[in-house]
Protein backbone atom coordinates (compact mmCIF):
# COMPACT_ATOMS: atom_id res chain seq x y z
CA UNK A 1 0.00 0.00 0.00
CA UNK A 2 2.84 2.31 0.89
CA UNK A 3 4.41 1.54 -2.51
CA UNK A 4 1.13 2.40 -4.28
CA UNK A 5 0.95 5.79 -2.57
CA UNK A 6 4.54 6.53 -3.56
CA UNK A 7 3.88 5.50 -7.16
CA UNK A 8 0.70 7.61 -7.22
CA UNK A 9 2.55 10.62 -5.82
CA UNK A 10 5.37 10.20 -8.38
CA UNK A 11 2.90 9.96 -11.24
CA UNK A 12 1.13 13.13 -10.11
CA UNK A 13 4.42 15.04 -9.77
CA UNK A 14 5.73 13.94 -13.17
CA UNK A 15 2.36 14.57 -14.83
CA UNK A 16 2.07 18.07 -13.41
CA UNK A 17 5.70 18.76 -14.33
CA UNK A 18 5.03 17.64 -17.92
CA UNK A 19 2.02 19.95 -18.19
CA UNK A 20 4.05 22.85 -16.81
CA UNK A 21 6.90 22.14 -19.23
CA UNK A 22 4.49 21.93 -22.18
CA UNK A 23 2.96 25.29 -21.23
CA UNK A 24 6.41 26.95 -21.15
CA UNK A 25 7.63 25.59 -24.54
CA UNK A 26 7.56 27.97 -27.50
CA UNK A 27 5.78 26.50 -30.49
CA UNK A 28 7.96 25.34 -33.39
CA UNK A 29 8.03 27.83 -36.26
CA UNK A 30 5.71 26.97 -39.12
CA UNK A 31 7.59 25.36 -42.02
CA UNK A 32 6.83 27.23 -45.21
CA UNK A 33 5.72 25.55 -48.42
CA UNK A 34 7.71 25.26 -51.61
CA UNK A 35 5.76 26.29 -54.66
CA UNK A 36 6.46 25.66 -58.31
CA UNK A 37 4.87 25.21 -61.66
CA UNK A 38 4.65 22.47 -64.25
CA UNK A 39 4.42 23.71 -67.81
CA UNK A 40 3.11 21.22 -70.30
CA UNK A 41 3.24 21.58 -74.03
CA UNK A 42 3.25 19.43 -77.11
CA UNK A 43 1.42 18.76 -80.30
CA UNK A 44 -0.84 15.91 -81.35
CA UNK A 45 0.05 14.86 -84.89
CA UNK A 46 -1.52 12.52 -87.40
CA UNK A 47 1.61 10.59 -88.42
CA UNK A 48 3.32 7.25 -87.90
CA UNK A 49 5.63 8.64 -85.17
CA UNK A 50 6.12 11.66 -82.98
CA UNK A 51 9.35 13.62 -82.68
CA UNK A 52 11.07 13.07 -79.32
CA UNK A 53 11.82 16.22 -77.32
CA UNK A 54 15.54 15.36 -77.47
CA UNK A 55 15.39 15.80 -81.25
CA UNK A 56 14.00 19.30 -81.41
CA UNK A 57 16.55 20.69 -81.70
CA UNK A 58 19.33 18.16 -82.24
CA UNK A 59 22.51 19.81 -80.94
CA UNK A 60 25.81 19.05 -82.71
CA UNK A 61 28.88 20.49 -80.97
CA UNK A 62 32.05 20.21 -83.03
CA UNK A 63 34.08 21.86 -80.25
CA UNK A 64 37.41 22.83 -81.87
CA UNK A 65 38.53 21.75 -85.35
CA UNK A 66 42.05 22.68 -86.48
CA UNK A 67 42.26 24.34 -89.90
CA UNK A 68 44.76 21.63 -90.90
CA UNK A 69 41.98 19.03 -90.53
CA UNK A 70 40.17 20.76 -93.42
CA UNK A 71 43.04 20.54 -95.93
CA UNK A 72 42.39 18.76 -99.24
CA UNK A 73 38.59 18.87 -98.73
CA UNK A 74 38.78 16.50 -95.76
CA UNK A 75 35.59 16.07 -93.73
CA UNK A 76 36.37 16.94 -90.11
CA UNK A 77 34.35 16.45 -86.95
CA UNK A 78 32.18 13.60 -88.24
CA UNK A 79 29.71 13.74 -85.35
CA UNK A 80 27.13 10.93 -85.38
CA UNK A 81 23.68 11.92 -84.11
CA UNK A 82 20.13 10.57 -84.31
CA UNK A 83 16.74 12.04 -85.00
CA UNK A 84 14.68 10.15 -82.43
CA UNK A 85 11.07 9.29 -83.17
CA UNK A 86 8.74 8.05 -80.45
CA UNK A 87 5.53 6.05 -80.27
CA UNK A 88 6.02 4.74 -83.81
CA UNK A 89 3.26 2.56 -85.23
CA UNK A 90 4.42 0.36 -88.13
CA UNK A 91 0.82 -0.35 -89.12
CA UNK A 92 0.68 3.31 -90.25
CA UNK A 93 4.08 3.39 -92.04
CA UNK A 94 7.03 1.03 -92.44
CA UNK A 95 9.85 3.45 -93.38
CA UNK A 96 10.84 7.08 -93.02
CA UNK A 97 12.94 9.46 -95.08
CA UNK A 98 14.34 12.83 -94.07
CA UNK A 99 14.72 16.00 -96.12
CA UNK A 100 17.27 18.49 -94.79
CA UNK A 101 17.16 22.20 -95.60
CA UNK A 102 19.89 24.57 -94.42
CA UNK A 103 18.80 28.07 -93.45
CA UNK A 104 21.52 29.30 -95.85
CA UNK A 105 23.25 27.21 -98.53
CA UNK A 106 26.99 27.87 -98.89
CA UNK A 107 27.57 30.21 -101.86
CA UNK A 108 30.76 28.45 -103.03
CA UNK A 109 29.86 24.80 -102.39
CA UNK A 110 26.13 24.10 -102.70
CA UNK A 111 26.58 20.75 -100.91
CA UNK A 112 27.38 22.59 -97.66
CA UNK A 113 25.30 24.64 -95.27
CA UNK A 114 26.70 28.10 -94.71
CA UNK A 115 27.76 29.46 -91.34
CA UNK A 116 25.06 31.92 -90.27
CA UNK A 117 26.99 33.54 -87.42
CA UNK A 118 30.46 33.64 -85.95
CA UNK A 119 33.70 34.82 -87.54
CA UNK A 120 34.94 31.55 -89.12
CA UNK A 121 34.81 31.43 -92.91
CA UNK A 122 35.92 29.38 -95.90
CA UNK A 123 34.13 26.23 -94.74
CA UNK A 124 30.63 24.89 -94.21
CA UNK A 125 28.61 22.03 -92.77
CA UNK A 126 27.69 18.83 -94.61
CA UNK A 127 25.61 15.81 -93.65
CA UNK A 128 25.64 12.11 -94.49
CA UNK A 129 22.47 10.05 -94.13
CA UNK A 130 21.89 6.64 -92.52
CA UNK A 131 23.27 4.97 -95.66
CA UNK A 132 26.51 7.03 -95.43
CA UNK A 133 25.51 8.96 -98.55
CA UNK A 134 26.07 12.70 -98.83
CA UNK A 135 22.81 14.52 -98.18
CA UNK A 136 21.40 16.55 -101.06
CA UNK A 137 19.48 19.50 -99.63
CA UNK A 138 15.69 19.35 -99.98
CA UNK A 139 15.87 15.74 -101.21
CA UNK A 140 14.63 12.65 -99.37
CA UNK A 141 17.35 10.47 -97.88
CA UNK A 142 17.70 6.70 -98.03
CA UNK A 143 14.62 5.17 -96.31
CA UNK A 144 15.09 3.95 -92.74
CA UNK A 145 13.08 1.01 -91.41
CA UNK A 146 10.74 2.00 -88.57
CA UNK A 147 10.15 -0.18 -85.53
CA UNK A 148 7.23 -0.02 -83.13
CA UNK A 149 8.00 2.30 -80.24
CA UNK A 150 11.25 4.27 -80.60
CA UNK A 151 12.94 4.57 -84.00
CA UNK A 152 16.17 6.43 -84.64
CA UNK A 153 17.30 7.99 -87.90
CA UNK A 154 21.08 8.42 -87.77
CA UNK A 155 23.08 11.06 -89.58
CA UNK A 156 26.66 12.32 -89.53
CA UNK A 157 27.51 16.03 -89.50
CA UNK A 158 30.90 17.26 -90.66
CA UNK A 159 32.82 20.46 -91.38
CA UNK A 160 34.50 20.82 -94.77
CA UNK A 161 36.37 23.56 -96.63
CA UNK A 162 34.31 25.22 -99.36
CA UNK A 163 36.87 24.27 -102.00
CA UNK A 164 40.34 22.74 -102.31
CA UNK A 165 41.93 26.19 -102.47
CA UNK A 166 39.66 27.91 -99.90
CA UNK A 167 41.31 30.05 -97.26
CA UNK A 168 39.76 28.79 -94.05
CA UNK A 169 39.63 31.54 -91.43
CA UNK A 170 39.61 30.32 -87.80
CA UNK A 171 36.81 31.43 -85.50
CA UNK A 172 33.51 30.40 -84.01
CA UNK A 173 30.61 29.37 -86.22
CA UNK A 174 26.96 28.40 -86.06
CA UNK A 175 24.72 26.91 -88.71
CA UNK A 176 21.08 25.85 -88.81
CA UNK A 177 19.72 22.92 -90.81
CA UNK A 178 16.00 22.16 -90.64
CA UNK A 179 14.61 18.70 -91.30
CA UNK A 180 11.33 17.08 -92.24
CA UNK A 181 10.54 13.40 -91.69
CA UNK A 182 8.21 11.77 -94.24
CA UNK A 183 6.68 8.34 -93.77
CA UNK A 184 6.09 5.60 -96.34
Curated annotation (Swiss-Prot):
Disulfide bonds join 49-88. The keyword Magnesium does not apply. It comes from the Bacteria. Keywords: Disulfide bond, Fimbrium, Signal. The keyword Disulfide bond applies. GO terms for cellular component: pilus. One of its GO terms (biological process) is cell adhesion involved in single-species biofilm formation. It is found in: Fimbrium. Residues 1-22 form the signal peptide. Belongs to the fimbrial protein family. Major structural component of PMF fimbriae. This is Major fimbrial subunit. It comes from Proteus mirabilis (strain HI4320).
Amino acid sequence: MKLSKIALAAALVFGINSVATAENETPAPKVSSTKGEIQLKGEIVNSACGLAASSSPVIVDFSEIPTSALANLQKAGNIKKDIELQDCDTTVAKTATVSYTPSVVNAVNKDLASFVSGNASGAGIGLMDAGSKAVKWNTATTPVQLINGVSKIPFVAYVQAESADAKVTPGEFQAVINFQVDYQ
